[in-house]
């Protein structure tokens, strides 16, 4: 057992928890069954005919191929002025390979805003909150579970930017080192850097000024020792390009694939707004056709990103082939 390595990991996880310096839950959330309809914009009167009930903490919901609306309003605290605010959602799902886990489209003040699921359980709500503003949030939630097995725990979190930066800068190096062999030089070097960095943290009182100052010092050390442009690097350039793999007809009806395409591409657009350097590639023209029909405004956003050179359309086939079943002749006919 490597006690030093385990200690580093524990401290990184602790920083992950300390990133959230404030958390706010809605006073009430209402829930109603929803139709198989995907509005890009909805008006409050559209909710008038629904059979609403209060969604209490700990309530479960779900079912096979079903949709639900969740609706609430949240007033941000006045002292959150200038804070970076995230919308957080937990449904209780834990299986990363469960493609039927709850998937949600978020509407902010009536406008389609973002998407959430097991892998995307936080989205940016405010880069710098005004403080005291009221936000209307509605959630169009899809379930394909056998029964009422899902939860719906919504909260808004104020993010500490400096702790968040240090957390990810440490986590990237830890994840990288963890993939290496115990005796590899690269791992030993990273372990030394990580250990020296976490040793700078004053964890005696994480709410005090000494801890806040130590976070700045640890980040400065990490930038100088590892992330600095002056640090000699191997002559290797790696380009990270985003991609989403969507099976058009698999574990859910084809009509749900149309919504899945909208959810996935909306996530990409939001990430591009938050991270201008982000690049994305997707094939399967059929998916673009679905998005064009279901959410034309989103399709136009994609076209803008393509023109900017940030979104690459790829692929020789209209629909991605299942190469386990297809014959060589059918694949060639599809391409031609």
What residue spans do the PLM features occupy?
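Carbohydrate-active enzymes and regulators
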Residues: 1-336
């Amino acid at each position: 057992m490597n006690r030093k390595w385990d200690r580093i990991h524990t401290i990184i996880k602790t920083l992950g928890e300390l990133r959230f310096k404030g958390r706010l839950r809605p006073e009430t959330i209402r829930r109603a069954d929803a139709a198989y309809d995907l509005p890009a914009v909805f008006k409050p009167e559209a909710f008038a005919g629904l059979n609403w009930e209060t969604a209490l903490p700990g309530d479960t919901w779900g079912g096979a191929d079903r949709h639900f609306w969740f609706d609430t309003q949240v007033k941000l605290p006045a002292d959150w002025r200038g804070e970076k605010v995230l919308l957080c959602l937990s449904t209780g799902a834990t299986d990363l390979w469960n493609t039927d886990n709850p998937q949600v489209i978020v509407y902010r003040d009536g406008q389609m805003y973002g998407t959430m699921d097991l892998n995307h359980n936080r989205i940016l709500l405010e880069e710098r909150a005004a403080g005291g503003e009221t936000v209307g949030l509605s959630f169009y939630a899809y379930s394909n579970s056998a029964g009422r097995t899902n939860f719906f725990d919504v909260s808004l979190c104020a993010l500490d930017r400096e702790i968040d930066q240090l957390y990810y800068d440490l986590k990237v190096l830890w994840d990288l080192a963890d993939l290496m062999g115990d005796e590899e030089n690269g791992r030993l070097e990273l372990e030394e850097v990580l250990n020296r960095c976490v040793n700078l943290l004053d964890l005696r009182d994480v709410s005090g000024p000494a801890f806040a100052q130590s976070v700045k010092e640890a980040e400065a050390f990490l930038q100088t020792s590892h992330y600095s442009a002056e640090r000699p690097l191997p002559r290797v350039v790696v380009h990270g390009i985003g991609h989403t793999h969507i099976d058009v007809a698999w574990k859910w009806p084809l009509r749900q694939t149309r919504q899945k395409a909208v959810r996935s591409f909306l996530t990409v657009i939001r990430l591009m707004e938050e991270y201008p350097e982000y690049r994305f590639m997707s094939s399967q023209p059929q998916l673009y056709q679905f998005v064009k029909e279901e959410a034309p405004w989103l399709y136009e956003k994609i076209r803008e990103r393509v023109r900017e050179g940030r979104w690459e359309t790829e692929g020789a086939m209209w629909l991605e082939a299942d190469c386990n079943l297809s014959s060589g002749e059918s694949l060639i006919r599809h391409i031609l």
